[in-house]
Amino acid sequence: MPVDFTGYWKMLANENFEEYLRALDVNVALRKIANLLKPDKEIVQEGDHMIIRTLSTFRNYIMDFQVGKEFEEDLTGIDDRKCMTTVSWDGDKLECVQKGEKEGRGWTQWIEGDELHLEMRVEGVVCKQVFKKVN
């Protein structure tokens, strides 16, 4: 059975985030603001149905999906694009592929101990985030 990501997670590290946003063509003002934020993640998982809430003082983003089923993801407020997204299990990791204007876009998420690791990719740029479980 896949790992359970359910919980509330506080950000510990956010490596190469501004470069990731630059690769998404996010304007410089938004990149500077976003780079100062330390968003939390609230994840609810019921089987293969997941809701991932990314919460910050500036903007919130909610991703609600069924693992293994492609859906249209509206990234308004991030880079204002839409893409066709599929999230799949790869062992105990979640692998996301986001098909759209940008090449090689997606992310991988996994748990090590009480830490949630998120590696986001676009056009060869990689951002690594680490969160600590608080409940």
Swiss-Prot record:
GO terms for molecular function: all-trans-retinol binding; fatty acid binding; retinal binding. GO terms for biological process: fatty acid transport; lipid homeostasis; retinoic acid biosynthetic process; retinol metabolic process; vitamin A metabolic process. Residues 22-32 are annotated as: Important for interaction with STRA6. Pfam families: Lipocalin. InterPro entries: Calycin (IPR012674), CRBP1 (IPR031264), Fatty_acid-bd (IPR000463), ILBP (IPR031259), Lipocln_cytosolic_FA-bd_dom (IPR000566). CDD domains: CRBP1. It is found in: Cytoplasm; Lipid droplet. One of its GO terms (cellular component) is cytosol. It comes from the Eukaryota. SUPFAM superfamilies: Lipocalins. Keywords: Cytoplasm, Lipid droplet, Retinol-binding, Transport, Vitamin A. All-trans-retinol binds at K41, M63, Q109. Interacts (only as retinol-free apoprotein) with STRA6. Belongs to the calycin superfamily. Fatty-acid binding protein (FABP) family. Cytoplasmic retinol-binding protein. Accepts retinol from the transport protein STRA6, and thereby contributes to retinol uptake, storage and retinoid homeostasis. Forms a beta-barrel structure that accommodates hydrophobic ligands in its interior. This is Retinol-binding protein 1. It comes from Bos taurus. The gene is RBP1.
